[in-house]
């Protein structure tokens, strides 16, 4: 599904995207099942996160991809799934065409390629209990697209308003207190079983906007108000990423936490 989250307006000058990425294993988990795609890079399959934020500053001309993956599965299957998706994103982004029409079809095709890569990784591991979420931004010189599969999230902060752009793919049936709802979609589902439908939202790229991609290790620890407050108090992307991760750890750090914070100038 494709939705517009702001109206049309021409962008007369080129904008610059600034971004920082940080990942932490958390205080409870024995391994980091998160991964990311950031400035052409991802983490190794076996990792404990990043000690310091990765940083990107780039004039927006052709498309820029940023993505967070949250793997799931027993043993080391979560790490394998997230790494397989991040690696495939590297391959997909190395061949991004300069002009894309229509963008929705391109974004959907990338998601399908990521899904197939995780399905193949599961086959090699002889398991069906492997998958990963995806939350991504695709930024062009005029537009920004938020794309997700699963419950990792994408947000925009504009003029003090914190808006969720992603859509959680979770079971709506009520569960016992303390239990998280099951995912209805994720990367790693065999197309013969279910054809995934990525949620895609489109908006105009405007100077002053801030964006956040994150795994549920952040939003399970912090409220939207707390996240907004941290982002408003930390206008620079690197300190903001560090402050968000530290706040999640201070609240208990029960899960891996990965964030990508972006600013548009």
Question: What are the residue ranges of the model-derived segments?
Answer:
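PP2C/PPM-type serine/threonine phosphatase catalytic domain
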Residues: 1-265
């Amino acid at each position: 599904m494709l939705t517009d989250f702001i109206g049309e307006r021409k962008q007369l000058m080129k904008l610059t995207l600034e971004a920082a990425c940080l990942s932490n294993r958390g205080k409870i988990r024995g391994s980091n099942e998160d991964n990311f795609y950031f400035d052409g890079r991802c983490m190794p399959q076996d990792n404990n996160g990043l000690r310091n934020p990765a940083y990107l500053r780039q004039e927006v001309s052709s498309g820029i991809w940023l993505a967070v993956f949250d793997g799931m599965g027993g043993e080391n299957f979560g790490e394998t799934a997230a790494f397989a998706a991040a690696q495939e994103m590297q391959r997909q982004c190395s061949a991004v065409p300069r002009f894309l029409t229509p963008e929705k079809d391109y974004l959907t095709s990338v998601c399908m390629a990521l899904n197939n890569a995780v399905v193949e990784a599961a086959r090699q591991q002889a398991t069906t209990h492997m998958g990963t979420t995806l939350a991504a931004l695709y930024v062009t010189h005029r537009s920004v697209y938020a794309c997700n599969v699963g419950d990792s999230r994408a947000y925009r902060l504009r003029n003090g308003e914190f808006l969720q752009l992603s859509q959680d793919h979770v079971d709506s049936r009520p569960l016992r207190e303390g239990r998280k709802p099951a995912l209805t979609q994720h990367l790693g589902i065999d197309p013969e079983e279910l054809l995934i439908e990525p949620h895609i939202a489109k908006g105009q790229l405007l100077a002053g906007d801030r964006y956040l991609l994150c795994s549920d290790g952040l939003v399970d620890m912090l409220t939207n108000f707390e996240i907004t407050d941290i982002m408003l108090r930390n206008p620079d992307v690197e300190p903001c990423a560090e402050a968000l991760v530290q706040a999640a750890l201070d609240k208990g750090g029960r899960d891996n936490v990965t964030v990508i914070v972006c600013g548009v100038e």
